[in-house]
Amino acid sequence: FTGILGQVITHEEGHRSVLTELGIGSVSKPFFDKNLVAKVTGVTDETLINLRNTDFPNFIRLHTAGLESDYAYLKKEDHLFNFNEEDYGTIYADYFARKLGSQFYYLTLLFKTKVDIKEQDDKELDRDIVGHDIYGMIRHLHRPEMEFYRYTNYNQLTYEEQKYAKKIGYLSLFNFLNPNIWRGKKVQLSENTLATPSISFSLAPFGYFIEENMSLLINNK
């Protein structure tokens, strides 16, 4: 349950938390609607435009926070695995489902994915705050002063923006190098020391980052 439906809840709460921190009210709807998307609603265009014009980093984070939330949750589960605080039999199903769910979002960037949702089909307060998280982030990073709209499709990106999207999609494949996905064994460095190396990729308000980690388990601690 937590791996499939739970990720939708925590992902959308990641988006909403940015608004909550800024004192902006919103409504999380973490259940799939008629367009098969979960969303955060209850925010006017005027509020979002003002956020873009006065607090651009947080406006971009509004797009990335869902995937950042997925990343933070999975990093915590990596910690539990790496330091033997949980075994694969307990939370692996949750971990694997969440990993694939977030990775699927990144892999949509490798194809000409169309978000067939028109803003005018919903009332303003019923619209998702950002639409496609990554397309919206990319468009606003490259063209922060262009006409405001929420739902960004692949064909609305410039050639350079499309290249940037594909770059993110390819770089996200680093996430498959995490040995916990494959239930890999730790590396024996000495009689009392085990290591778990990993590489992770995620979005951030400035674009993206790649993180290298080495977890050391010494005397089983």
Sequence positions of predicted segments:
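Hydrophobic alpha-helical membrane segments
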Residues: 1-221
